[in-house]
Amino acid sequence: MTPMGTNYGETSGEMSNRHMNYYSLRAKGGTGLIILENANIEYPAGSNGTSQIRIDHDSFMPRYYQLVENLHKNGATVAIQINHAGASASSARTGMETVSSSNIPTKVGGEVPRPMTKEEIL
């Protein structure tokens, strides 16, 4: 199953009970590979919304562990899509400068991001 943003995340970035049920039903239905939706790797700068799940801190791992154990018990293999919103992030929402790989906005009239330096990327 390809990663699809459900927008079920808690405002804290935790996976909700709704997430747990959503993915569990797919594993029980016979899905062999489940790729979890885009998880933020740098909060708040890399966030693409208030309902995006996070994986930028160890405090989120117990919930992932619980989900993965459940999915494995139901026969599914699990992967996750990691995400940094880059130019799609909004400085109005994050309160931080928008950065990306270039200064090209993601849409016409969109916020112009600051290109990251090689040192920032490494």
PLM regions with names:
Residues 2-122:
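Flavin-dependent oxidoreductase catalytic cores
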